[in-house]
Amino acid sequence: MRVRRLVMLRHGQTKSNADSRMQGQLDTELTDLGHAQAASAAEVLAKRQPRLIVSSDLSRAYDTATALAQRCAVSVSTDKGLRETHLGQWQGLTHSEVDALAPGQRQAWRDDATLAPHGGESRIDVADRSRPVVAKILLNEPEWGADDCDRPVVLVAHGGLIAALTASLLDLPVDSWPVLGGMGNASWAQLSGHGPDAAALGDLRWRLDVWNASAQVSNDVL
């Protein structure tokens, strides 16, 4: 039996975050504050000596991952499976614009993991496409948790994806998924996967160790 630590880090601030604009899979860049947030998170997480860093291929996540990689001499690989929720016709709109377009739907979507914006994904969809990323890491990293169980694999991604993947790994009832609230920019979650030395994803029992941890107190939870 061994314990595998999985850290999931949200990207730093973008202008869309600052403007309460829903990005989804639009490729947006970090602001100056976002770069500073990424550097602060990197300073803390580098001390954990990550064994692997896998990032969404969207710029805001990749640049956040690069800040960490530069501090711990680990290269960054990317996986499209870690992209943010596709928000369909809501992408690029502010919260107010979405509420005017579809009154009540944004709150309903937040409260129900099975709902998706028109042309977009539900949280169930997001979990289904991101779980294989973790399964692939288990296959390709047989020493994960064997040499030093505190050395994590770090996924750098997006708030919606992190919440969906966390809920799925914890095997929460779908109607309880919204209990996981928003994450601040450059904040992270940590899960521990308990299972046999040679394990597939379904063999692990996951526990939530940390949610919305940050190098600094933040009021940007969106």
Model-derived regions: residue spans:
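Acidic, low-complexity terminal tails and accessory targeting/binding regions
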Residues: 1-4, 74, 88-97, 139, ...
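Loop-to-helix element that buttresses phosphate recognition and phosphoryl-transfer chemistry
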Residues: 7, 13-68, 114-131
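Phosphate-coordination/substrate-recognition cap region in phosphate-metabolizing enzymes
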Residues: 39-106
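Active-site signature of alpha/beta-hydrolase-fold catalytic machinery across serine-
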Residues: 67, 164-168
